[in-house]
Regions:
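Secondary-structure end/capping motifs
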Residues: 213-297
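Short, solvent-exposed loop/beta-turn-alpha elements that line the ligand-binding surface or hinge
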Residues: 39, 85-86, 195-198, 269-279
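Conserved C-terminal helix/tail region of periplasmic/extracytoplasmic solute-binding proteins
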Residues: 284-320
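A bilobed periplasmic-binding-protein/Venus flytrap-type ligand-binding module shared by bacterial periplasmic
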Residues: 30-32, 102-112, 201-217, 271
Length: 320
């Protein structure tokens, strides 16, 4: 693959990026607001999705070029197991974009055990993809089987976050910093994915292999900007400016919310993966869960089928 040149990206068509709403977009906000995308001649149009069905339909139809999404969605939609009736046969992950902390099963305060979830309703973004598969594994570990509970589709994490606060359901899985914020509000962390797995690859930057090949320099520039934004966020001398960017993009939040988000997303040991490093064992766990719970059942490939590290490797060589 040709190593990236940062002198001739000004004619590149805008990149259409679709993300879930939330503080985990902080590196995207930094790359946008501090000119890291523009530095390399990139224009990035960011759209927030209400859920994975909209996101993957958009990617399949070519309205989105890049998505930040759960690794499980990459596998599901490549293999025809997604919630939406679309297949993205060349879907690939190209970079990790998530903290290393495991998702937590957050419940109403009166739910004190798995047995208390019998007959209750639990919320997911989509019933066949994403964190839903971890939820099923946790419920099975807790002695519950399908039929002991109901599943309702609420869409992306903001919908689940607000729905739990409105008491629309008994519980749902949340990544950081939403799980931490809910604990601060008095909701119960009943369990975490760490009780059923040691590794799990969460959010990744994903695209279509065909688009990546045709737009390799633009993709490399995008990944370089995102990696540089993560490095900038880890630098404690930038915290005041980082909080200002947070408030600009989440105007309903205050410095306390920013502090909570920062403490978990950029924790030196469990925060965002440096250099976008993907956890291959984490992808293997995604495949294990999908082999067990995915529909229709099918034989899945090795982690390398769903992750191409070459674009990130080239981008990082160009930035050193």
């Amino acid at each position: 693959m040709t190593e990236i040149s940062y002198n001739d990206l000004s004619s590149t068509a805008p990149i259409n990026l679709m993300v879930f709403a939330g503080a985990f977009n902080w590196p995207v906000w930094v790359a946008q607001d501090r000119g890291l995308f523009a530095r390399d001649g990139l224009t990035v149009n960011v759209t927030e999705t209400p859920g994975s069905v909209v996101q993957w339909t958009s990617l399949a139809e070519g309205r989105s070029d890049i998505v930040i999404t759960l690794m499980d969605n990459v596998v599901a939609y490549r293999e025809g197991q997604g919630e939406a009736p679309v297949t993205v046969s060349d879907a690939i992950a190209v970079m990790a974009s998530d903290a290393l902390l495991m998702p937590a099963l957050m419940t109403q305060p009166d739910i004190k055990s798995y047995d208390d979830l019998r007959g209750q309703t639990l919320s997911v973004d989509a019933a066949l993809t994403g964190l839903a598969l971890i939820l099923y594994a946790l419920l099975e570990k807790g002695g519950l089987k399908p039929g002991d509970y109901q599943i309702v589709r609420t869409g992306g994490v903001l919908g689940r976050f607000e729905g739990l606060k409105r008491h629309e359901f008994a519980g749902a899985l949340f990544n950081t910093p939403f799980s931490t914020q809910l604990e601060e509000l008095g909701y119960r962390s009943l369990d975490t994915a760490a009780s059923v797995m040691q590794h799990y690859q969460g959010h990744v930057v994903a695209t279509r292999a065909g688009w990546a090949q045709e737009n390799s320099r633009a993709l490399q520039g995008f990944l370089r900007a995102l990696s540089d934004a993560i490095d900038w966020l880890y630098d404690p001398t930038n915290k005041a400016d980082a909080f200002a960017i947070f408030r600009d993009h989440m105007p309903a939040s205050d410095d306390k919310a920013a502090g909570i988000a920062y403490s978990v997303l950029f924790d030196p040991k469990a925060g965002f993966a440096r250099n976008g490093a993907v956890d291959i064992d984490g992808i293997a766990k995604v495949l294990e869960l999908r082999s067990k719970f995915g529909q229709p059942a099918k034989r899945l490939g090795q982690p390398s089928r769903y992750f191409d590290p070459s674009y990130l490797e080239t981008a990082l060589r160009g930035s050193r």
